[in-house]
Regions:
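Extended, Lys/Arg-enriched charged tracts that mediate electrostatic binding to polyanionic substrates
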Residues: 16-53
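Short, surface-exposed "cap/lid" segments of acyl-processing enzymes
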Residues: 47-50, 59-100
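Serine hydrolase/lipase
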Residues: 64, 93-112, 119-154, 168-285
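Gly/Ala-rich beta-loop-alpha elbow adjacent to hydrolase catalytic centers
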Residues: 155-159, 163
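A structural "domain/chain start" motif
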Residues: 189, 269-318, 419-428
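C-terminal/domain-edge helix-coil "capping" segments
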Residues: 276-284, 343, 364, 374-428
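A short, hydrophobic beta-strand-centered structural micro-motif
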Residues: 284-291, 334-360, 368
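Short beta-strand->alpha-helix linker/helix-N-cap micro-motif
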Residues: 310-334
Length: 428
């Protein structure tokens, strides 16, 4: 459960990044943790392909993890795929058989899939997944044959449907079920009930939705004859964000929250080492103070933002001491904090404040990270505020990550020992 929750957060970050692959801070963030990412585009005249291929090695499990992420709907071509709701016959173990069967009428009690999703996956297969003899090639051949390789297929909305159906096709083409997992976010059903019954158990599918997202059930509701399958994971969504219930940024927030819950559970059971508030190496020690404004402390998701920020500071700093986490606002002066930091043995003091201010008459707020760095003598080395406009309850972790990315650059200018590249690690 813990490993699944960990890779769900990675998949969610990648699903955000694939929408803007060349400027994505989510991809930059993943790269800083060792992920090698390449975006892929293609067009066969009918279907426009947009996905990303990433890989990273995890020494704790001795696995080379490959992550293939399909973009959700973002163009007219994508919506043509979505609206091609006619069902086509499903089956076959070669491209020729698949194409031939899809052209035939769906028999009574036969397995059938969404015509648009099927054409998209067919284009993916022809783009380099298989050769002219319908044998796995390249990346997918390597994954299938390498005992230390494992594949994660993922996507949001249309991307999730693509990942699901591609997973089914890979099994039909000879890839063992045990070699991969499919993780989807807000994805519609891909086939009818016969397809779900005959093929649903052929892949490991983690199907993530939420209590307010209409897309996963849209085909069943509006067109009928479609059925979901796989392991359902449903996030309980606040009614305050009903207009953003399908946003990938929302799924990212909730995946982080669920990951923290699972991490805490594993720590309480003794399966993971507790996160330390003190790490001392030969590098200078930095005392870290993180606080949120009084107006934010009552909001449940702010706890996740603080944990995310603290985790990132831990990874940036070779030597650190996490000081009082819930510092009362204005309870201490800067000089008081400096004295406490020096007494703890710190050479530097890093103060971070997390603020959220709602714009008048707007349904959005500005999530701001205020960061100040001082040496032990009180000399201010850098100070700055980094903000993002977000919904009050959606996109906060994404915004916090973007703010932290800028904040880290400011620290790098003053502290040459800041760590910007990290080894992939399942611990936290």
């Amino acid at each position: 459960a813990y490993v699944q929750s960990y890779f769900t957060t990675i998949a969610a970050a990648s699903c955000l990044g694939v929408y803007l692959p060349h400027t994505s801070q989510e991809f930059d963030y993943l790269r800083s943790y060792g992920w090698q990412i390449e975006s892929q585009q293609g067009n066969d005249g009918k279907v426009e392909l947009n996905y990303a291929v990433a890989k990273n090695y995890f020494p704790q499990i001795n696995k080379q993890i490959y992550l293939v992420t399909f973009r959700g709907s973002a163009s007219k071509s994508d919506w043509k795929i979505n609206l091609a709701t006619k069902k086509v016959n499903y089956g076959g173990s070669t491209l020729a058989e698949m194409h031939e069967l899809a052209a035939q009428p769906v028999p009574k009690d036969g397995a059938a899939v969404h015509a648009g999703f099927n054409s998209y996956v067919d284009a993916v297969l022809r783009s380099g997944v298989v050769d002219e003899n319908s044998k796995l090639r390249g990346l997918f051949k390597r994954i299938s044959e390498d005992p230390d390789a494992y594949l994660v297929l993922t996507g949001h909305s249309l991307g999730g449907a693509t990942a699901t159906l591609l997973g089914e096709r890979l099994v039909s083409l000879g890839m063992p079920k045990e070699k991969f997992v499919v993780i989807t976010f807000g994805a519609p059903a891909v086939g009818n009930s016969v397809f779900a019954e005959q093929y649903g158990n052929k892949i490991k599918l983690v199907r993530i939705s939420n209590t307010a997202d209409p897309v996963p059930g849209s085909l069943q509701t509006f067109f009928g004859g479609y059925k979901q399958f796989g392991e359902p994971v449903k996030y309980s969504l606040s009614n305050k964000i009903s207009n953003l219930q399908h946003a990938m940024a929302m799924y990212f927030d909730y995946s982080i929250s669920e990951y923290y819950k699972e991490r805490d559970k594993q720590i309480s059971m003794g399966r993971l080492e507790p996160v330390t508030d003190r790490k001392i190496t030969q590098q200078p020690v930095v005392a870290v103070w993180v606080n949120t404004s009084d107006s934010l402390k009552k909001l449940a998701y702010v706890t996740d933002i603080k944990r995310f920020v603290l985790d990132e500071y831990r990874k940036m700093l070779p030597s650190y001491i996490i000081m009082e986490r819930n510092l009362p606002k204005d309870a201490y002066t800067t000089q008081d904090l400096l004295k406490l930091s020096r007494d703890a043995g710190a050479e530097y003091m890093l103060v971070c404040g997390i603020e959220g201010n709602q714009a008048p008459k707007e349904g959005y707020w500005y999530l701001t990270l205020e960061q100040g760095l001082f040496d032990k003598n009180g000399r201010m080395l850098t100070i700055g505020a980094f903000g993002r406009k977000v919904s009050p309850a959606v996109g906060n972790i994404q915004a916090a990550g973007e703010n932290l990315w800028q904040a880290r650059e400011a620290l790098c200018e003053q502290l040459p020992f800041i760590v910007t590249q990290h080894e992939a690690h399942l611990g936290y």
